[in-house]
């Protein structure tokens, strides 16, 4: 269940992605198979390793951190541009382990020693949920299926078409920036009827789009796992033994649920109306927390109605909300961010303190972006995007906009489009990017939603 790519200097990645402290001592830990600092190679992807709101995340990332912590060793992460680069790093001794899915095939077995939990994936059909689901590949005859041009999905679909005697209407999309996630979104929104993607990508996207079905497998299974050098049987055995125990534990089940089951939709719940976002326009009351929005807005030079709009979109003014990523409270503050602002986890859901930290963050983001985007109304969109995604991804999007002839000072149809490009390895591996893969669609939607409610509040509530 995972996948993707990029190359950054070792020291840069080590500084942002270490998930455990360096323990002093000999070159090797008390377990002679494991060095005191485990050098981990991986690729940016929605399943293995990515940055979100300043935190490092990913199913493979969490699991390798758990392994290292169980052994009492530190970690250093090195991000490669592709799987062959990772294997070359492993072979040359730059890294100790690949925490990314390496296919278990005769070809790869000549180069690496697979270890740890095996993950089995398939190519699956993505279709809208309905009462008339396609449940057999034969039913694809006379159906329109859309796939990426010259992709493994197109190759499999053409083979399948031959196997069943023809009749599948195959649409090979040759678009520069298209990804599997784009095609899944098009199915979810009714723009295309069917597509084919890997099951791990399908599982993650099902947490964003609950109206799709991914049950029909259309390929043979592919086995994959982590890998070490062929001469490092001791480390392989240690990882495999840990994996066997971890799979039955609560922590591993929680990781699976976090990345592959919990809803990640950035959209507001259905049934919410503009009227429900305001207690009383007549009396100038947006929420029960207006006193805090006003106080911390004034202290930080921020329109309190903007803070309220963020609070509504983030949590619908509920202080007990916890997101899949661990963000908490009315303003959905990440625990790591809270600690950086002196707010301990036990107090993170306190409305006053939660809103105070959010206001401080927004003030800081505005200060950083002021040098790049002079127009305050335009800059507000950038600030909202950075609040939702993390500043690093927005700076990447600005850099991509500059490189690919878009206006880096304008959000709509310019930097927002560049942010969407960061879901594609062609662009997040670009030399101007420093923060890797990012799924930008939810951030684009977030900016639009907050802007809508801010405009609504400004039209109905006095400052």
Task: Tell what function each PLM region has.
Residues 378-456:
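Catalytic and substrate-binding regions of cell-wall glycan-acting enzymes that process beta-1,4-linked
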Residues 263-317, 352-355, 369-373, 462-463:
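Export/targeting segments at the very N-terminus of extracytoplasmic proteins
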Residues 42-46, 117-131, 200-243, 262-264, ...:
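Periplasmic-binding protein-like
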Residues 84, 99-110, 158-159, 185-220, ...:
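A ligand-binding cleft/hinge motif common to bilobed small-molecule-binding domains
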Residues 58-70, 129-153, 201, 220-266, ...:
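Extended ligand-binding regions for polar small-molecule ligands
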Residues 149, 320-346, 353-364, 450:
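Substrate-binding/active-site groove segments that recognize
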Residues 19-102, 106-110, 171-178, 239:
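Extracytoplasmic small-molecule ligand-binding "clamshell" domains
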Residues 39-69, 103, 124-178, 283, ...:
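Bilobed "Venus flytrap"/periplasmic-binding protein-like clamshell domains
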């Amino acid at each position: 269940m995972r996948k993707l790519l990029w190359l950054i200097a070792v020291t840069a990645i080590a500084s942002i992605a270490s998930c455990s402290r360096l323990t002093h001592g000999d070159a090797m830990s008390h377990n002679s198979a494991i060095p005191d600092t485990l050098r981990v190679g991986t690729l940016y992807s929605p399943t293995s390793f990515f940055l979100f709101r300043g935190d490092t995340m990913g199913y493979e990332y969490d699991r390798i951190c758990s392994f290292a912590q169980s052994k009492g060793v530190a970690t250093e992460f090195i991000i490669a541009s592709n799987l062959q680069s990772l294997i070359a790093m492993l072979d040359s001794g730059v890294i100790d382990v690949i925490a990314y899915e390496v296919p278990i095939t005769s070809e790869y077995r000549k180069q690496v020693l697979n270890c740890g939990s095996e993950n089995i994936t398939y190519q699956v059909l993505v279709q809208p949920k309905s009462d008339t689901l396609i449940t057999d590949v034969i039913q694809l005859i006379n159906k329109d299926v859309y796939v990426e041009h010259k992709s493994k999905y197109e190759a499999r679909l053409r083979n399948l078409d031959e196997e069943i005697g023809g009749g599948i209407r195959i649409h090979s999309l040759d678009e520069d920036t298209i990804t599997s996630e784009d095609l899944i979104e098009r199915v979810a929104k009714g723009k295309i009827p069917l597509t084919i993607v890997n099951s791990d990508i399908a599982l993650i996207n099902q947490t964003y789009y609950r109206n799709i079905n991914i049950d029909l497998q259309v390929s043979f299974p592919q086995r994959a796992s982590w890998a070490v050098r062929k001469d490092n049987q001791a480390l392989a055995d240690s990882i495999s033994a840990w994996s066997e125990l971890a799979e039955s534990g609560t922590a591993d089940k929680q990781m699976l649920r976090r990345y592959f089951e919990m809803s990640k939709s950035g959209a507001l719940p259905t049934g919410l109306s503009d009227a429900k976002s305001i207690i009383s326009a007549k009396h100038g009351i947006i929420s029960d927390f207006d006193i805090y929005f006003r106080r911390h807005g004034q202290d930080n030079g921020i329109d309190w109605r903007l803070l309220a709009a963020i609070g509504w979109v983030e949590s619908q003014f509920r202080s007990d909300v916890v997101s899949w990523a661990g963000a908490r409270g009315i303003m959905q503050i990440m625990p790591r961010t809270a600690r950086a602002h002196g707010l301990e986890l036990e107090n993170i859901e306190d409305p006053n303190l939660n809103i105070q930290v959010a206001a401080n963050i927004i003030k800081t983001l505005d200060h950083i972006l002021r040098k790049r985007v002079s127009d305050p109304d335009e800059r507000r969109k950038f600030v909202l995007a950075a609040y939702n995604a993390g500043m690093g991804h927005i700076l990447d999007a600005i850099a991509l906009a500059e490189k690919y002839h878009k206006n880096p000072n304008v959000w709509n149809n310019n930097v927002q489009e560049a942010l969407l490009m960061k879901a594609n390895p062609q662009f997040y591996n670009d030399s101007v990017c420093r923060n890797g893969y990012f799924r930008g669609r939810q951030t684009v939607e977030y900016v639009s939603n907050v802007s809508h409610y801010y405009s609504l509040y400004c039209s109905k509530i006095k400052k």
